[in-house]
From Swiss-Prot:
It is an enzyme of class 4 (lyase). Its cofactor is Mg(2+). The lineage of its organism: Eukaryota, Viridiplantae, Streptophyta, Embryophyta, Tracheophyta. It comes from Sorghum bicolor. Its main location: cytoplasm. This is Phosphoenolpyruvate carboxylase 2. Coiled coil: none annotated.
Length: 960
């Protein structure tokens, strides 16, 4: 126990002053670390364990004293290791950071429970506390004087659609995620009140077993995941938390309504929460997403949905054993009973024919047969492409599944058994309404250019010219005349390139599969009305019976500025207005706009574009839904959910919100039951609050000031990123961007075009690379110049900026997120990368950027009125401090590994290897080196590099 107390003491030194005594984070952290170090000692010997502790201590000293010599000392220790040892060290620190994340998740859930018991607010994520649904409803009724009926009406009609995307940043393998989930559960149980000594011992053993199993699992994906892999990984969250979480959450909403005096439940068909997905539908820049992949993914989702329903319907059959029923149900049950001939031996329960005096079971057994057939048909279609089960024996629409369940519900209520009806049957009805037969609706995303290619091929084939070269007016005129006409445009003899066939086959897949598989058709890089009409025409030509809604996506700064005018032109087309029936969705992209103009200008332009788009829609009497394409990182629009929603412009949400939930954020949102519950709660509560109590509209003088700042910020950002001739070379040298492609994180290439500068780099690797060196350039660059400009112009502007920070949620959130990124950043680390990797003549550029970083941070604190970073959020500050020493060790390890990879003349004297292997103590950890035979670098270097990348990503929690 002595050692545990020494780790404990070391960790306690890092705690900021304002953290309360009942905070359990240090205890959790110390316990997991101690168990891990014991395991490390057992597996690899004392020397290696001591090395890990020494590295940690030197890094912790650097963090407290900021003495740059400590980084050199750490560098010497790490570079003297042999390849096998350096893999073990990198793996150990990466593993310790994953454990720290788990301790934190358990801690957040624990503080939330304490808070609910005490009934007070503990600041969780920021100055503005997130609320649960109950607090929100009470606040709306008590403080904001809304009537309970108004609140109920608003809640019933609102929809939050969470769109899961497989972003290449989910850096943790599923094999590890499952082990992490078990470690989390052990930790929760170990600290529960009523635990016996025997339980404690067994749980502790289980904890050690899971920590060791995770450590012994290869963290690195040795093959790149296919889109089908990504989709299966995304769907695993439905199995594990979302499926059961939704009805549980909706029950909590019922309870919250009861507490404000509404004695009704949320109707089961109220679309409070919906789920969609891009996995296997997003083909923008990902050649691996083919029409076959889309078809597979839809069938797989249908199979999974019917499987989940099958597993639950037997429980429902057990529950509904009543014999009293309505005449309507009795007639249906008798009819079904007469037509059922045989026993069903392939079921475990209720395999004999159900007797007529159990009418509900008769009805449900018929539903079960159809679900079984639906599942088997999807399975057969998936594996061989055809099925002997006729489609009429399966469920093809969600109404077919809802109808018999609704019949049971009505009958129970009519017989005075409403209490029973409101049990599992209501949960089941709510699941069917939420998930349908396809579990999630798949969005299709494609670049507008690809549609232009297809139409160009068609017009050339018809001999009427080149669509690509036509001006917008001519394009619209032709598209509308075709849409109003009846004749087919082209036959099977249309000459097609592979790319064109791919686009058309995608539409054929949409036509072939049931309509409820699909959500929206999103056009990226959309600029003009013809982009939208083109997709409408192609859907018609490929015989899509229920056309998908077409959603333009505006990303680049110039496109965002032009978006309102483009939408107005689209709405003024009569044909289109009739087609959309008063509803339109528009997607706005956060990633590319940030890469194009910097964070400040992008955030402000997104704000203004939304206001104007809503205004255009109002003028035409259209209800507009905004679809927010936010990343997990701040540079790509991430940040705490409730704040992001509450800081949107007034009137822009209006009860309907679509948001992407990406890669690593899926794990943080749905990885565990409590987290999943909190996520659903946050989105629902914040959307309701934004609609019923919109944030203040900014004052005209705030707008003028921000407009002026945005111009300066964009100028400063572009003058460095796009106009500084040495910048691209500096970026490639100072970060691991070139090596990023080797990580096998996602199924899509990291570049849109193989050669070229920053423009062709995807937003994700661009952010990922800067996050790795803890310099976060894309997030803050531009803020400093903007602040400096307005303060030099008139010092009274400082007062106005502070007023904006205190009174305008949007501005506050923008500044708070950048402050959080500064708290995670470390220019000393970035300087180390420069010293080791950047050529002599480029170093002054790095120095100039670091001076800019320091100045921006100073100005930002002045505007926020803070003396220190994060002084308003001691808990976040504590969490960041606890992990700094681990991340620093990984940074030093990464910088020196990059040096060894890139500089063939860089040699160091290696010490004898430290690590012992259990099976054969004479064998070093060099076995690890053989896991990667295809590496083009010296043995062990590539794996060490990848492990440091994954570790730093886990530590900073906002990868790309």
């Amino acid at each position: 126990m002595e050692r545990l107390s020494s780790i404990d003491a070391q960790l306690r030194m890092l705690v900021p002053g304002k953290v309360s005594e009942d905070d359990k984070l240090i205890e959790y952290d110390a316990l997991l670390l101690d168990r891990f170090l014991d395991i490390l000692q057992d597996l690899h010997g004392d020397d290696l364990k001591e090395m890990v502790q020494e590295c940690y201590e030197v890094a912790a000293e650097y963090e407290t004293k900021h003495d740059l010599q400590k980084l050199d000392e750490l560098g010497k220790m790490i570079t003297s290791l042999d390849p096998g040892d350096s893999i073990v060290i990198a793996k150990s620190f990466s593993h310790m950071l994953n454990l720290a994340n788990l301790a934190e998740e358990v801690q957040i859930a624990y503080r939330r429970r304490i808070k609910l018991k005490k009934g007070d607010f503990a600041d969780e994520n920021s100055a503005i506390t997130e609320s649960d649904i109950e607090e929100t409803l009470k606040r709306l009724v008590v403080d904001l004087k809304k009537s309970p009926a108004e609140v109920f009406d608003a809640l019933k009609s609102q929809t939050v659609d969470l769109v899961l995307t497989a972003h290449p940043t989910q850096s943790v393998r599923r094999s590890l995620l499952q082990k992490h989930s078990r470690i989390r559960n052990c930790l929760v149980q170990l600290y529960s009140k009523d635990i016996t000594p025997d339980d404690k011992q067994e749980l502790d053993e289980a904890l050690q077993r899971e920590i060791q199993a995770a450590f012994r699992t290869d963290e690195i994906r040795r093959t790149q995941p296919t889109p089908q892999d990504e989709m299966r990984a995304g769907m695993s969250y439905f199995h594990e938390t979302i499926w059961k979480g939704v009805p549980k959450f909706l029950r909590r909403v019922d309870t919250a309504l009861k507490n404000i005096g509404i004695n009704e439940r949320v109707p089961y068909n109220a679309p409070l929460i919906q789920f969609s997905s891009w996995m296997g539908g997003d083909r923008d820049g990902n050649p691996r997403v083919t029409p076959e992949v889309t078809r597979d993914v839809c069938l797989l989702a249908r199979m999974m949905a019917s499987n989940l329903y099958c597993s639950q319907i037997e429980d429902l059959m057990f529950e509904l054993s009543m014999w009293r029923c309505s005449d309507e149900l009795r007639m249906r049950a008798d009819e079904l009973h007469r037509s059922t001939k045989k026993d069903a031996k392939h079921y475990i329960e209720f395999w004999k024919k159900v007797p007529p005096n159990e009418p509900y079971r008769v009805i449900l057994s018929d539903v079960r047969d159809k679900l079984y057939n639906t599942r088997e048909r999807s399975r057969e279609l998936l594996s061989s492409g055809h099925s002997d089960i006729p489609e009429e024996a399966t469920l093809t629409t969600v109404e077919q599944l809802l109808e018999p369940l609704e019949l049971c519900y009505r009958s129970l209520c009519a017989c005075g058994d409403r209490v029973i009806a409101d049990g599992s049957l209501l949960d089941f009805l709510r699941q069917v309404s939420t998930f349908g037969l396809s579990l999630v609706r798949l969005d299709i995303r494609q670049e507008s250019d690809r549609h232009t290619d297809v139409l160009d091929a068609i017009t050339t084939y018809l001999g009427i010219g080149s669509y690509r070269e036509w001006p917008e007016e001519r394009r619209q005129e032709w598209l509308l005349s075709e849409l109003n006409g009846k004749r087919p445009l082209f036959g099977p003899d249309l000459p097609k390139t592979e790319e064109i066939a791919d686009v058309l086959d995608t539409f054929h897949v949409i036509a072939e599969l049931p309509a409820d598989n699909f959500g929206a058709y999103i056009i990226s890089m959309a600029t003009a009305p013809s982009d939208v009409l083109a997709v409408e025409l192609l859907q018609r030509e490929c015989h899509v019976k229920t056309p998908l809604r077409v959603v333009p996506l505006f990303e680049k700064l110039a496109d965002l500025e032009a978006a309102p005018a483009a939408l107005a032109r689209l709405f003024s087309i009569d044909w289109y207005r009739q087609r959309i029936n008063g509803k339109q969705e528009v997607m706005i992209g956060y990633s590319d706009s940030g890469k194009d103009a910097g964070r400040l200008s992008a955030a402000w332009q997104l704000y203004k574009a939304q206001e104007e788009l809503i205004k255009v829609a109002k003028d035409f009497g259209v209800k507009l839904t905004m679809f927010h394409g936010r990343g997990g990182t701040v540079g790509r629009g991430g940040g705490p959910t409730h704040l992001a929603i509450l800081s949107q412009p007034p009137d822009t949400i209006h009860g309907s919100l679509r948001v992407t939930v990406q890669g690593e954020v899926i794990e943080q949102s749905f990885g565990e039951e409590h987290l999943s519950f909190r996520t659903l709660q946050r989105f629902t509560a914040a959307t309701l609050e934004h609609g019923m109590h919109p944030p203040n509209a900014p004052k005209p003088e705030w707008r003028t000031l921000l407009d002026e700042m945005a111009v300066v910020a964009t100028e400063e950002y572009r003058s460095i990123v796009f106009q500084e001739p040495r910048f691209v070379e500096y970026f490639r040298l100072a970060t691991p961007e070139t090596e990023y492609g080797r990580m096998n994180i996602g199924s899509r290439p990291s570049k849109r075009k193989p050669s070229g500068g920053i423009e062709s780099l995807r937003a994700i690797p661009w952010i990922f690379a800067w996050t790795q060196t803890r310099f976060h350039l894309p997030v803050w660059l531009g803020f400093g110049g903007a602040f400096k400009h307005v303060l030099q112009k008139d010092i009274r502007n400082l007062h106005m900026l502070q007023e904006m920070y205190n009174e305008w949620p949007f501005f506050r959130v923008t500044i708070d997120l950048v402050e959080m990124v500064f708290a995670k950043g470390n220019p000393g680390i970035a300087a180390l990368y420069d010293k080791l990797l950047v050529s002599e003549e480029l170093r002054p550029l790095g120095e100039k950027l670091r001076a800019n970083y320091e100045e921006t941070q100073k100005l930002l604190l002045q505007v926020a009125g803070h003396r220190d970073l994060l002084e308003g959020d001691p808990y976040l500050k504590q969490r960041l401090r606890l992990r700094d020493a681990y991340i620093t060790t990984l940074n030093v390890c990464q910088a020196y590994t990059l040096k060894r990879i890139r500089d063939p003349d860089y040699h160091v004297a290696l010490r004898p290897h430290l690590s012992k292997e259990i099976m054969d103590p004479t064998k070093a950890a060099s076995e690890l080196v053989k896991l990667n035979p295809g590496s083009e670098y010296a043995p062990g270097l590539e794996d060490t590099l990848i492990l440091t990348m994954k570790g730093i990503a886990a530590g900073l929690q906002n990868t790309g």
